[in-house]
Protein backbone atom coordinates (compact mmCIF):
# COMPACT_ATOMS: atom_id res chain seq x y z
CA UNK A 1 0.00 0.00 0.00
CA UNK A 2 1.24 3.45 -0.95
CA UNK A 3 0.17 6.90 0.19
CA UNK A 4 -1.62 7.66 -3.09
CA UNK A 5 -3.61 4.41 -2.77
CA UNK A 6 -5.17 5.28 0.61
CA UNK A 7 -8.94 5.70 0.62
CA UNK A 8 -11.30 7.09 3.26
CA UNK A 9 -13.77 4.85 5.02
CA UNK A 10 -17.16 4.77 3.24
CA UNK A 11 -19.48 7.66 4.21
CA UNK A 12 -16.77 9.29 6.33
CA UNK A 13 -16.42 12.32 4.06
CA UNK A 14 -20.11 13.20 3.59
CA UNK A 15 -20.30 15.85 6.34
CA UNK A 16 -19.96 19.36 4.97
CA UNK A 17 -18.95 22.20 7.29
CA UNK A 18 -21.66 24.83 7.79
CA UNK A 19 -20.51 28.06 6.12
CA UNK A 20 -22.23 30.94 7.90
CA UNK A 21 -22.28 34.71 7.65
CA UNK A 22 -21.86 34.92 3.86
CA UNK A 23 -24.94 36.84 2.77
CA UNK A 24 -28.69 36.40 3.14
CA UNK A 25 -28.95 34.36 -0.08
CA UNK A 26 -27.08 31.50 1.57
CA UNK A 27 -29.80 31.04 4.17
CA UNK A 28 -27.27 31.50 6.96
CA UNK A 29 -26.27 35.12 6.45
CA UNK A 30 -26.33 38.14 8.78
CA UNK A 31 -26.99 36.53 12.18
CA UNK A 32 -25.75 33.09 11.05
CA UNK A 33 -28.70 31.14 12.41
CA UNK A 34 -28.34 32.55 15.92
CA UNK A 35 -31.45 34.74 15.92
CA UNK A 36 -31.32 38.33 17.12
CA UNK A 37 -29.70 39.66 20.30
CA UNK A 38 -29.25 37.86 23.59
CA UNK A 39 -26.67 35.74 25.36
CA UNK A 40 -26.88 32.84 22.91
CA UNK A 41 -26.25 35.18 19.97
CA UNK A 42 -22.86 36.25 21.32
CA UNK A 43 -19.59 34.43 21.00
CA UNK A 44 -19.00 32.19 24.03
CA UNK A 45 -22.69 32.62 24.74
CA UNK A 46 -23.19 29.46 26.75
CA UNK A 47 -23.04 28.96 30.49
CA UNK A 48 -20.53 26.63 32.07
CA UNK A 49 -21.58 23.09 33.01
CA UNK A 50 -23.28 23.04 36.41
CA UNK A 51 -24.39 26.71 36.23
CA UNK A 52 -27.97 27.14 37.50
CA UNK A 53 -28.65 30.79 36.72
CA UNK A 54 -27.07 32.27 39.84
CA UNK A 55 -28.74 29.89 42.29
CA UNK A 56 -26.23 27.97 44.40
CA UNK A 57 -25.55 24.92 42.23
CA UNK A 58 -26.13 21.36 43.36
CA UNK A 59 -22.43 20.55 43.60
CA UNK A 60 -22.04 23.36 46.16
CA UNK A 61 -25.25 22.58 48.07
CA UNK A 62 -24.23 19.00 48.81
CA UNK A 63 -21.54 18.29 51.40
CA UNK A 64 -18.09 17.06 50.51
CA UNK A 65 -17.42 13.48 51.53
CA UNK A 66 -14.90 10.69 51.19
CA UNK A 67 -11.16 10.49 51.09
CA UNK A 68 -9.00 8.21 48.96
CA UNK A 69 -5.59 7.27 50.31
CA UNK A 70 -4.25 6.48 46.86
CA UNK A 71 -0.61 6.65 47.88
CA UNK A 72 -1.00 4.14 50.69
CA UNK A 73 -3.35 1.61 49.13
CA UNK A 74 -1.83 -1.84 48.67
CA UNK A 75 -1.91 -2.71 44.99
CA UNK A 76 -1.89 -6.29 43.76
CA UNK A 77 -1.36 -7.72 40.30
CA UNK A 78 -4.19 -10.06 39.36
CA UNK A 79 -3.34 -13.01 37.13
CA UNK A 80 -6.11 -15.26 35.84
CA UNK A 81 -5.97 -19.06 35.96
CA UNK A 82 -6.92 -19.04 32.27
CA UNK A 83 -3.63 -17.30 31.42
CA UNK A 84 -1.66 -19.64 33.66
CA UNK A 85 -3.32 -22.69 32.05
CA UNK A 86 -2.07 -21.59 28.61
CA UNK A 87 1.56 -21.71 29.78
CA UNK A 88 3.24 -25.05 29.19
CA UNK A 89 4.91 -25.03 32.59
CA UNK A 90 4.37 -26.99 35.79
CA UNK A 91 6.01 -24.60 38.28
CA UNK A 92 4.86 -21.00 38.08
CA UNK A 93 6.49 -18.09 39.92
CA UNK A 94 7.17 -14.37 39.40
CA UNK A 95 10.22 -14.93 37.15
CA UNK A 96 8.24 -17.18 34.80
CA UNK A 97 5.37 -14.68 34.55
CA UNK A 98 7.89 -11.91 33.74
CA UNK A 99 9.61 -14.14 31.15
CA UNK A 100 6.31 -14.77 29.35
CA UNK A 101 5.38 -11.05 29.48
CA UNK A 102 2.32 -11.51 31.69
CA UNK A 103 3.58 -9.04 34.30
CA UNK A 104 6.20 -6.31 34.06
CA UNK A 105 9.68 -6.84 35.44
CA UNK A 106 9.62 -3.31 36.90
CA UNK A 107 6.74 -3.91 39.33
CA UNK A 108 7.34 -5.18 42.81
CA UNK A 109 3.68 -5.58 43.78
CA UNK A 110 2.32 -8.85 45.17
CA UNK A 111 0.73 -11.27 42.70
CA UNK A 112 -2.78 -12.61 43.27
CA UNK A 113 -4.09 -15.56 41.27
CA UNK A 114 -7.81 -15.44 40.53
CA UNK A 115 -10.24 -17.67 38.67
CA UNK A 116 -11.99 -20.97 39.31
CA UNK A 117 -11.21 -23.34 36.42
CA UNK A 118 -8.04 -25.23 35.60
CA UNK A 119 -7.58 -28.83 34.53
CA UNK A 120 -3.82 -29.33 34.63
CA UNK A 121 -1.57 -29.98 37.60
CA UNK A 122 0.62 -26.97 38.49
CA UNK A 123 2.75 -25.78 41.39
CA UNK A 124 2.33 -22.08 42.23
CA UNK A 125 4.77 -19.85 44.14
CA UNK A 126 2.85 -16.60 44.62
CA UNK A 127 1.81 -14.02 47.23
CA UNK A 128 -2.00 -14.30 47.30
CA UNK A 129 -4.73 -16.53 45.87
CA UNK A 130 -8.51 -16.40 45.73
CA UNK A 131 -10.62 -19.12 47.32
CA UNK A 132 -11.98 -20.30 43.96
CA UNK A 133 -8.51 -20.55 42.44
CA UNK A 134 -7.22 -22.41 45.49
CA UNK A 135 -9.98 -25.04 45.24
CA UNK A 136 -9.50 -25.42 41.47
CA UNK A 137 -5.73 -25.98 41.73
CA UNK A 138 -6.05 -28.42 44.61
CA UNK A 139 -8.81 -30.40 42.87
CA UNK A 140 -6.60 -30.65 39.76
CA UNK A 141 -3.83 -32.14 41.93
CA UNK A 142 -1.66 -29.03 42.06
CA UNK A 143 -0.05 -27.29 45.01
CA UNK A 144 0.30 -23.72 46.25
CA UNK A 145 3.23 -22.14 48.05
CA UNK A 146 2.55 -18.68 49.48
CA UNK A 147 5.68 -16.53 49.68
Curated annotation (Swiss-Prot):
One of its GO terms (molecular function) is structural constituent of ribosome. InterPro entries: Ribosomal_uL15, Ribosomal_uL15/eL18, Ribosomal_uL15/eL18_sf, Ribosomal_uL15_bac-type. Pfam families: Ribosomal_L27A (PF00828). The keyword Cell membrane does not apply. Keywords: Ribonucleoprotein, Ribosomal protein, RNA-binding, rRNA-binding. GO terms for cellular component: cytosolic large ribosomal subunit. One of its GO terms (biological process) is translation. Residues 10-21, 37-46 have a biased composition (Basic residues). Gene3D superfamilies: 3.100.10.10. Residues 1-57 are annotated as: Disordered. Residues 22-36 have a biased composition (Gly residues). It comes from the Bacteria. Binds to the 23S rRNA. Belongs to the universal ribosomal protein uL15 family. Part of the 50S ribosomal subunit. This is Large ribosomal subunit protein uL15. The lineage of its organism: Bacteria, Bacillati, Mycoplasmatota, Mycoplasmoidales, Mycoplasmoidaceae. The gene is rplO.
